[in-house]
C-alpha cells in the first residue's frame, strides 16, 4: 500500500467517526420529547478528533446504555448492566439514562433504572430533573415511582419552573391533582423567573380545563408578571377566546392594562384574533383610547393589517376618526402604509378626510409624501365624491350608488373603451400643463393637483399625471350616471381643446351603437 495513501486513510478515520457521532447527536436532539422545555444552546465547535474521542462525553458502553433506555430495550440494558456500565453516566447535556426513559414515558425502562438505584436528583444543563420531565410528559405512574424513589418534588430549573409550572403549562390535570391534593405542595404555586405562576402559564397556552382546575384549587391569581401581563393579557395575546371567557368569570376588569398600557382588546387586535375581538366587544371592552395608550384599537388593527378586525371594530361603532399620539387618524396610518384595502374600508365608513396631524398633513398629503399613487388617487376620488354628495344631498338619498361604490382603480370591462380613449388622450394628445387646465376646470383643488404631481419619474411624468387625473374625473362622471364621452366632449370644448373634442366625438359616434351602461368604479 502507498504509505501516503495509508497515512491519509488513517487521518480520515477519526473524522469519519466524528461525522457519524455528530449525525447521531443531531438525530437524538431532534427526537427529544422535552425539547420545548428548554432552549438548546448552540454547540461549540470542536475539532473532529476531539469529537470522535468523546462523543457526548460518554464511553461507548454508556452511550449504548442510554440508547437502550430511549428505546426501552430492557434486554440490552440488562446485559450492559451486567458488564458494570455506569447507569448514572451523563452526556454533554448532563442527562442520564433516566432522563431519556422518563422523557419517553417508558414505564418499563424507568422501573428497571429505579430498581437498580439510578440517581433521581441529577439536573441537566438547563436545570431539568426527572421530576420536571414527568410533570411535563404527564405520566402519573412514573411520577409516583419517582416520588417514591425520593426525587426532589420542589426542584426548579434555570427558569425557576417547578413541577407544578410544567404540569400546568402542558395541561396535565392528574399531575396537578397529585401535587396539590396528595402531596400538599401548595408552596409550588410561586412565580418563575419571569414572574409567572402556573395559572399564568395555563392561560398563556389556553388550557381551559387547567384554568378551571387551578381556580377550583384556589391557585388562580390576578397578579401581573414581570412584563405587567395578567393571565387575561397572556390568553388574549394568543387568541384563546374560551380561556378569556373563563378568566372573565373571575374578575370583571376587561379593560385592565399591562405595564405598556395595553389592554386585552388591544392585544387581540394587534395579533388579528378576530373571534376574540368580537367576544371582548360583546363584554363591553373599551373602544376609546385609554389614557397614555399609544395606539387605539383601530390604529393597531390598521398597523398590523387586520382587515377582519377593522370591520369588527367599525361594526361596534369604533370612532373611525379617533386620533393617536401623533394626532393621526386610522386613515392617515393606512395611507402612509399604502394599504389599498384598508383605505377603501375606512373611506366607505365615512371618515373625515380633512383632519390634519401634528405636522398639519391630511391623509392625502401623507400618501403623496410616501409615494403611494394608488392611495392618492383613491383619496382624491373620495374627496370629490363626498363633496358631490354634500352638494346633491337631497337628490341622491335613495341612490343605489352606495351599494356599488368603490374608490379603487377601475379594471372593469364596461369602462375599457373609455379608459383606452383617456390613455390615448393623456399620452398622445395632451401637452405639458394641459392636464392641470382640465383638472382646474373639473374643480380639482390645488392640494389634489400637487398630490398627483408628487409622483415624479422624469420630464415625461405629465403623461402619467394627466392619465391619473382623467381617471379620477371618470370616476366622478360615472357617479353622475351621465354619458362620460359626451360629457368629456363638451368640457374639452369649454376648455379650449376643439381638436381633442372632435376626436372624442368621433369615438362616441363609433361606440354609441354598442355602448353599455358603465358601473361605478
From Swiss-Prot:
InterPro entries: Ankyrin-DD_containing_protein, Ankyrin_rpt, Ankyrin_rpt-contain_sf, DEATH-like_dom_sf, Death_dom
GO terms (BP aspect): signal transduction
Start-end of each ANK repeat: 60-89, 93-122, 126-155, 159-190, 194-223, 227-256, 260-289, 293-322, 326-355, 359-388
Keywords, in A-Z order: ANK repeat, Repeat
Domain of life: Eukaryota
Annotated signal peptide: none
Domain Death: 420-508
Ranges that cross the membrane: none
Name listed for the protein in its UniProt record: Ankyrin repeat and death domain-containing protein 1B
Species this protein is from: Mus musculus (Mouse)
Phylogenetic placement of the source organism: Eukaryota, Metazoa, Chordata, Craniata, Vertebrata
Amino acid at each position: 500500500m502507498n504509505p501516503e495513501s495509508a497515512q491519509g486513510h488513517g487521518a480520515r478515520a477519526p473524522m469519519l467517526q466524528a461525522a457519524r457521532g455528530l449525525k447521531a447527536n443531531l438525530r437524538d436532539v431532534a427526537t427529544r420529547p422535552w425539547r420545548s422545555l428548554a432552549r438548546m444552546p448552540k454547540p461549540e465547535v470542536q475539532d473532529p478528533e476531539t469529537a470522535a474521542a468523546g462523543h457526548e462525553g460518554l464511553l461507548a458502553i454508556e452511550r449504548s446504555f442510554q440508547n437502550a433506555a430511549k428505546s426501552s430495550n430492557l434486554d440490552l440494558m440488562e446485559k450492559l448492566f451486567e458488564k458494570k456500565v455506569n447507569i448514572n453516566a451523563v452526556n454533554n447535556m448532563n442527562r442520564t439514562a433516566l432522563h431519556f426513559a422518563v422523557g419517553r414515558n417508558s414505564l418499563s425502562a424507568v422501573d428497571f433504572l429505579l430498581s437498580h438505584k439510578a440517581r433521581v436528583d441529577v439536573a441537566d444543563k438547563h436545570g431539568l430533573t426527572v421530576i420536571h420531565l414527568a410533570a411535563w410528559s404527564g405520566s402519573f405512574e412514573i411520577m409516583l415511582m419517582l416520588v417514591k424513589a425520593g426525587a426532589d418534588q420542589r426542584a426548579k430549573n434555570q427558569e425557576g419552573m417547578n413541577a407544578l409550572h410544567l404540569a400546568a403549562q402542558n395541561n396535565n390535570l392528574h399531575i396537578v391533582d397529585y401535587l396539590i391534593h396528595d402531596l400538599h405542595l401548595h408552596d409550588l404555586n410561586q412565580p418563575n423567573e419571569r414572574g409567572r405562576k402556573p395559572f399564568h402559564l395555563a392561560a398563556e397556552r389556553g388550557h381551559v380545563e387547567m384554568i378551571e382546575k387551578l381556580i377550583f384549587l384556589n391557585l388562580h391569581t390576578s397578579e401581573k408578571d414581570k412584563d405587567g401581563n395578567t393571565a387575561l393579557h397572556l390568553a388574549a395575546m394568543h387568541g384563546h377566546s374560551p380561556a378569556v371567557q373563563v378568566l372573565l368569570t373571575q374578575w370583571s376588569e376587561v379593560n385592565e392594562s399591562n405595564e405598556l398600557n395595553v389592554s386585552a382588546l388591544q392585544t387581540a387586535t394587534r395579533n388579528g384574533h378576530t373571534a376574540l375581538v368580537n367576544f371582548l366587544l360583546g363584554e363591553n371592552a373599551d373602544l376609546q383610547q385609554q389614557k397614555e395608550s399609544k395606539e387605539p384599537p383601530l390604529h393597531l388593527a390598521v398597523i398590523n393589517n387586520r382587515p377582519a378586525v377593522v370591520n369588527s371594530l367599525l361594526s361596534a361603532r369604533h370612532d373611525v376618526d379617533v386620533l393617536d399620539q401623533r394626532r393621526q387618524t386610522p386613515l392617515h396610518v393606512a395611507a402612509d402604509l399604502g394599504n389599498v384595502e384598508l383605505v377603501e374600508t375606512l373611506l366607505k365608513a365615512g371618515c373625515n378626510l380633512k383632519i390634519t396631524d401634528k405636522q398639519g398633513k391630511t391623509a392625502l398629503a401623507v400618501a403623496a409624501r410616501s409615494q403611494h399613487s394608488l392611495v392618492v388617487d383613491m383619496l382624491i376620488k373620495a374627496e370629490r365624491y363626498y363633496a358631490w354628495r354634500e352638494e346633491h344631498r337631497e337628490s341622491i338619498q335613495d341612490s343605489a350608488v352606495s351599494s356599488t361604490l368603490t374608490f379603487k382603480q377601475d379594471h372593469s370591462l364596461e369602462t375599457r373603451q373609455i379608459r383606452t380613449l383617456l390613455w390615448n388622450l393623456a399620452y398622445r394628445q395632451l401637452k405639458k400643463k394641459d392636464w392641470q387646465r382640465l383638472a382646474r376646470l373639473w374643480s380639482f383643488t390645488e392640494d389634489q393637483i400637487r398630490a398627483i404631481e408628487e409622483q415624479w419619474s422624469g420630464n415625461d411624468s405629465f403623461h402619467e399625471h394627466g392619465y391619473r387625473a382623467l381617471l379620477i374625473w371618470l370616476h366622478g362622471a360615472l357617479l353622475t350616471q351621465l354619458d362620460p364621452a359626451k360629457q368629456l366632449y363638451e368640457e374639452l370644448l369649454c376648455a379650449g381643446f376643439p381638436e381633442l373634442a372632435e376626436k372624442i366625438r368621433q369615438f362616441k359616434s363609433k361606440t354609441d351603437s354598442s355602448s353599455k351602461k358603465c358601473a361605478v368604479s
